[in-house]
Amino acid sequence: MTEQAYAAIAAACDRLLRAPGTTLGRVAIPLLHVINEHPSCLAQYAPLLPSSSVTRSRPSPFTLLNSARVAARAGRAVTRLFRPPESLTRARALGQVDVLIISHLVSLSLLDTPDDFYFGALQSSLRERGVTSALVLLNHLHGEDARRAYTMRSFPATRMILPRTVLPRVEAQIWRQCAAARGYLRQAAHDAHDTVDQAVAKLASDHALSAGTAENLRLHACISDVCHLLNPRIIITTHEGDASERMIWHAARSTGRRPLCVGYQHARLFARAHAIRRSLGVPGIDCDPDVILTQGEIPHAALAASPGLGSIRLIAYGSHRRAEPMTLPALDERPRSCLVLPDGDDGECSILFEFALACARRAPEIAFALRPHPSVNLTALRSRHNALRQLPDNVTLSVSGTLDQECARARYCLYRGSSAVIQAVLAGIKPFYVARAGELPFDSLFALPYWRETLMSPEDFVTRVSATDASPDQDAARRAWAFCDRYVSRVRPAAIDELLDMVGAPVREPAQ
């Protein structure tokens, strides 16, 4: 995809979202929220590109007429009509809370940890201030793990897993909303004069019947139920700009008290990040955040320079994942080891691991540690990638120990879109971005003008690593460290007090 095509598609999606008569069903369509240039985000727009040769008459994999996938989806929907929703017993037992945190369950092992994977010790910090809170987890697990999560009872009473089913009448209403959104968008495609607007509206009409759209509307219904029971003053969730976040904030404002809606910019901010940089301003559908918490000085400045955010307030918060400073050996005193850091996308994991294995075959004197994202299921990962079952002698799969420990042992790292590379640079590691021909770059360190290098082939890696070892640029490494030190800050407790002050919540001073 070209820069021009990306910008045109993003603008067309925004026009559809802001058009008069936009419904909640339209806002729920994931396709209409252009997040960023990551390949996993761009894949859904492939039919809009010339090489796809998509025409009006071509059947889409998302339409009711393309029976195989949709028939299966319809069957699951019918089954869901007769399945009772999972219980909200914990919410009923809690009663009213001051702060509702919406986070994500990406691994069963994270359910019993004292701190949340995305928000760290936020609940503890609130409790120290005498502020009540509840942590609601969106269940992103699959198969047996997804079912087991609802039967586990060992986690704290102030945590709960959001139901993924709704009452039969609500399920039926959801699919009516999807069908209505499809009809409106097909009409918009028919009426459009611009070819991009026409193509985007047509594709969006197909996606109106996708599982993702229905899941977002189901999420809206479940969050409405939770907010009705807990009546929070503040609701906080992660924020990258996708449709599910809009569902959460709109649902929270639809019941009882109007809470302060907060988004936490927890992930890396790509050069072309779109949806997080603007408010939607959908007529009659209040789904923008009131506040965005930022994870560091650099992303804070980038969002502050985004005129599309309008009156949304930015508050510097930081990240619990920011590692404490450690005394580390100099780069030339470490073993010749390369840390491989994919993000949580399976396709990206495959690309980066295959590239690393190719490098390992060309440089047997260098050790490679393949470190999957914490959300990745290792059993499933091995089953999908045969190459991981029998690794070369100089390659290991890093599944134990912390990222800090791995960083302390490495000289170099391979990465693409992972924010873990920031932690690697803070540990003094030389970062190498793996690019591919024909794609928009999505380098997490795009704004870093020194120290990082771009690779197109394993041969590039061998050449660049040899040059780095022969003449390490310590000054560039120090400047890169300073950059990353500003990208992710330590948690700023005063940010919590600012939020509580905005809603007039009574607070006691936390113990020192």
Language-model regions: role of each:
Residues 1-512:
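Catalytic-core helical/loop segments in enzymes performing group transfer/polymerization on anionic/lipid-linked
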